[in-house]
């Protein structure tokens, strides 16, 4: 996703990039279908090395964009969780692997795990005029694996996420004019 983000900025002049999609969680306060705004994205591996060399970098969502999304969600009666997410390299890890491999953030306050966030936020951090945000919906939960979410409820959850993203983009574009 990092290369795609660079292309959107360099070739198309995009200034607000919002990653929408699904994530997993092991936070007991989050359930399948909940909407999450990620404040920062910690990488599981060294995928920031091509950009930062030997230095670690944990990119953050742009506060203005995050606040606009938070406000849009609340204006529409959509509850959101706000916190740090982890960006993994592998979606489904083998159960016979050590716990430290299957859940590298256990014991840390990561409210979500997904696979694209760090790349997007690293790319947007490169440009002073570009803002990035991770807006994700919990689709899988390690603690509540028995939560069976009906199709209509999943559609509502994903629609809520998209509504927040589109209204946030509209609001940011309107303010820029």
Describe the predicted segments one by one.
Residues 1-67:
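Metabolite-binding pocket within alpha/beta catalytic cores that recognizes anionic/polar moieties
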Residues 142-177:
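His/Asp/Glu-rich mid-to-C-terminal helical/loop segments that flank catalytic regions of hydrolases
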Residues 68-76, 123, 164-175:
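Generic non-transmembrane alpha-helical segments
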Residues 16-20, 37, 80-86, 111-115, ...:
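General beta-strand structural signal in soluble alpha/beta enzymes
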Residues 56-109:
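Active-site rim beta-loop-alpha module in soluble metabolic enzymes
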Residues 28-32, 48-49, 96-97, 125, ...:
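Short acidic, glycine/serine/threonine-rich loops at helix termini
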Residues 118-153:
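Zn-dependent metallopeptidase/amidohydrolase metal-coordination segment
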Residues 1, 58, 62-66, 78, ...:
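Generic structural signal for well-ordered, non-membrane alpha-helical segments
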